[in-house]
Structure formats: C-alpha cells, structure tokens
Amino acid sequence: MSDVLIRDIPDDVLASLDAIAARLGLSRTEYIRRRLAQDAQTARVTVTAADLRRLRGAVAGLGDPELMRQAWR
C-alpha cells in the first residue's frame, strides 16, 4: 500500500475532518482512507437517462398523501 502526503491543508478543514471522524469513532487517517475509497468507487458509477426514468417511476407515489397514509397503516 502506498502513502500519500498532502501539504497546505487549512486548519479549519482538518478540524472539520477530525470532528467527523470522531463522531464516527474513527481516526483521521481511517476516515480519510474510507472517504478516498468511497470517492474512487463513486467516480466509476455512471447514471444514465434510463436510470433516472426508473427512479422517477419508483418514487412517483411519494407525493400522493393518500398513498402515503395507506402505506403507513
């Protein structure tokens, strides 16, 4: 596994990363490692027009109050 050194990260950015990592019970290193892995994976995912049409069909009823009432009974 390779190491990466990143210089000139603003203090407020590091503080934010540390706070997020702490909330998740992770070290800064582990949090950044996971985010980089997640970002690398997400970059390979492409969303097509067909994907968006399927999504539109799947969530079409969410704006229907009666359908939502029935779903929660």
UniProtKB/Swiss-Prot annotation:
Highest taxon of the lineage: Bacteria
SUPFAM superfamilies registered for this protein in UniProt: Ribbon-helix-helix
GO biological process: cellular detoxification; regulation of DNA-templated transcription
GO molecular function, one term: toxin sequestering activity
Keywords: Toxin-antitoxin system
Pfam families membership: RHH_1
Function: Antitoxin component of a type II toxin-antitoxin (TA) system. Upon expression in M.smegmatis neutralizes the effect of cognate toxin VapC2. The C-terminal helix of the antitoxin may obstruct the toxin's RNA-binding groove, blocking access to the active sites. Additionally, the C-terminal arginine of the antitoxin may remove Mg(2+) ions from the toxin active sites.
Subunit structure: Forms a homodimer, which binds to a toxin homodimer, which then oligomerizes further to a hetero-octamer. When bound to toxin VapC2 the toxin activity is inhibited; 1 antitoxin may suffice to inhibit toxin.
Stated name of the protein: Antitoxin VapB2
Annotated source species: Mycobacterium tuberculosis (strain ATCC 25618 / H37Rv)
